[in-house]
Every structure is written in structure tokens, then in C-alpha cells.
Amino acid sequence: MLCLPVFIILLLLVSPAATMPVDLEILKAPTKESRKDFEMRIELLRSKRQCCRPANMSCCQG
């Protein structure tokens, strides 16, 4: 009889812990997208830095 309440308490403690990784994955998704945007922005800045030379200023306009 003593095992049943202990089992119920353990079951209640384990149930919320099982859903936590799903919540964390939802929170990670926007972070992955913003990292991708950040990398694209860095690539754009690098290409502009390489392109913008005094001899070739026409590509700096965009």
C-alpha cells in the first residue's frame, strides 16, 4: 500500500519533466532563424567591404 502513493508522486514529478524538451525546442527555433539572418548579414557586409574600393564604387549603392 505504501508503494502506490510513492508511485503516484513519482509519476507526477516525471510528467512535467517529459514535456520540457519540447518547450525548449520551440524556444530554440527562433534563435536558429536569427542566427541564419545574422550570418547572411555578415556575408553581405563582407561582400560590400570587398566590393567597395575607390576604383569600383558602383557596387556600393545597393
From Swiss-Prot:
Main location: secreted
Modified residues (Pyrrolidone carboxylic acid): Q50
One Pfam short name: Chi-conotoxin
PTM description: Contains 2 disulfide bonds that can be either 'C1-C3, C2-C4' or 'C1-C4, C2-C3', since these disulfide connectivities have been observed for conotoxins with cysteine framework V (for examples, see AC P0DQQ7 and AC P81755).
InterPro entries linked to this entry: T-conotoxin
Tissue: Expressed by the venom duct.
Disulphides: none
Residues spanning the signal sequence: 1-19
UniProtKB keywords: Amidation, Cleavage on pair of basic residues, Disulfide bond, Pyrrolidone carboxylic acid, Secreted, Signal, Toxin
Domain-level remarks: The cysteine framework is V (CC-CC).
Family named by the database record: Belongs to the conotoxin T superfamily.
Record's protein name: Conotoxin Lt5.8
Organism listed in the record: Conus litteratus
